[in-house]
Amino acid sequence: MEFSILADSFNKMESTRKRLELTQYLVELFKKTPQEVISKIVYLLQGKLRPDFEGVELGVAEKLAIRAISKSSGIPIKKIEEEYRKGGDLGHAATTILEQKTQTTFLVEDITVERVYETLFKIAKLEGNRSQDMKMKYISSLLNDASPLEASFILKILLGTLRLGIAENTVMDALALAFSGNKENRKILEHAYNVSSDLGKVAEVLATEGLAEVEKFKIILFNPIRPMLADRVKSEQEAIEKMGNEFAAEYKLDGERVQLHIEGDKVVLFSRSLENISSYYPDIIEKIPKTIQAENIVLEAEAVAINENTGEFLPFQELMHRRRKYKIEKAVTQYPITVNLFDILYCNGKSCLELDYKERREKMEKVVKEDDFVKHIPMAIVKNENDIEDFFENSINAGSEGLMLKTLVSPYQAGSRGSHWLKLKREYQNELGDSLDLVVIGGFFGKGRRTGNYGTLLLATYEEDEDTFTSICKVGTGFSDEDLDQLYQILNPKVTIKKNPRINSEMEADVWFEPELVIEVVASEITLSPIHKAARDKIRKGAGLALRFPKFTGKMRVEKMAEDASTNEEVITLYQGQKKVAHDKSLM
């Protein structure tokens, strides 16, 4: 397949922010795509080469890409850097530069999607002393034969700056339309994706074997399952209204959610965002098999840092020390953990997803022995507000954040958020009754002591129905100097030339970011806003919701994907809850 077809499609997609138009462009692209190439196209659309859990990263720096452009075009590095500074996008700069190309290539090889993909894959696999030279050689070979537009998108893929604003849901909509003619069939694709975490594979099977084969997707050991997510509630009373008379309550621990795939002595660990994190937890790899009484199993747990002397739970941030590349053995000793199990997804070759919560819990307790390192998260069956309050108090005294509430008869809904799981967190005195996990979508340059960093951030909630991120506040308090330095390092590579199509904000930021980083904030209250877009028109016509006096808690939720952020429905629930509290107080 000619790469020019893909480049033209990318160019159209970059020019619109409308989801329907993006979907239509994708449908047109998929219909032009040969069956054997469809998986590669889907991966490239996502800005990757393989599914996340395989950990294939291109690792190409801007300086290396600039050298490759210079080698291919014959134009000095300084001039390329000047063009880059004008627009802030190396892909766009390459288009301009290569139109002025002074070098002539006599033997031009066709640029195909297959060639580009295979070359990028070779680049991703290169290691060792000569790897940088080889990377430049491969990049230059592509740029030599590419048109300026093709080169632009090759570089954007290489640098991780392809900003099409296309979410996975939009890709699945387009696949369903292109290969079945019915958007409703997205549900079948979604199930396959939720159990495989590999959208490229789903697309390939759909294109080559049809929808009936996609329906046969099952859990594969050592491929992560997309996690089930929870809504939030503000009070015990609200929980009972949503869940009925009898349900389970578990401690909500402040740790890292881990999915454990185990067969014999082989253990692979995945994060909430499907990253392979086995290297961060050699202690889990070593100790967990001894507790398992099954041939193979997939479990979910919270890895929680503890004070080894007292056994008390420590904050999530303590686990970040384990994410360093080196000296992991030292970090394991300095920052010990316990593994706190809460679900079983697969056992002895069979899926447990369809089992009710109560059955899954009983099975988990039966096949996993507890010891000092591996625990079952404390659970109780609750029937009324007093039961919840008592267990909630126990959980807080034990060092947890609150409770997870789960209906007893619910299956495990991979990749879904719904009312079968609810979270009830501890109150913040004199503040909004819960923290919020918000997506960083924009930044404002700092002044005074904060010069050189982003002094204030623009944050957003996730709007599930529209698959967008809606502005809810600016936050500039709660940041230490170290936080600001770290945020600058994390956010700078995510700067985009224009606002991502999935961002819904009337407020203009100094810079826009790819919506990826999630941070935790608290606030004094939620108010109506004529400016912010969160829950716009849901409470009052022409008004959205905003946070009053928001403050960063110090927690960067690096384990969360942007789509795991607090939703507008959650914010509406919190807003209505605070209004009810105010009303109740007025009656006292």
From Swiss-Prot:
Its cofactor is Mg(2+). GO terms for molecular function: ATP binding; DNA binding; DNA ligase (ATP) activity; metal ion binding. It is an enzyme of class 6 (ligase). PROSITE patterns: DNA_LIGASE_A1 (PS00697), DNA_LIGASE_A2 (PS00333), DNA_LIGASE_A3 (PS50160). Keywords: ATP-binding, Cell cycle, Cell division, DNA damage, DNA recombination, DNA repair, DNA replication, Ligase, Magnesium, Metal-binding, Nucleotide-binding. The keyword Transferase does not apply. The active site is at K252 (n6-amp-lysine intermediate). Gene3D superfamilies: DNA ligase, ATP-dependent, N-terminal domain, DNA ligase/mRNA capping enzyme, Nucleic acid-binding proteins. It holds the Pfam family DNA_ligase_A_C. InterPro entries: ATP-dep_DNA_ligase (IPR050191), DNA_ligae_ATP-dep_bac/arc (IPR022865), DNA_ligase_ATP-dep (IPR000977), DNA_ligase_ATP-dep_C (IPR012309), DNA_ligase_ATP-dep_cent (IPR012310), DNA_ligase_ATP-dep_CS (IPR016059), DNA_ligase_ATP-dep_N (IPR012308), DNA_ligase_N_sf (IPR036599). Its EC number is 6.5.1.1. DNA ligase that seals nicks in double-stranded DNA during DNA replication, DNA recombination and DNA repair. Belongs to the ATP-dependent DNA ligase family. NCBIfam families: dnl1. This is DNA ligase. It comes from Nitrosopumilus maritimus (strain SCM1).
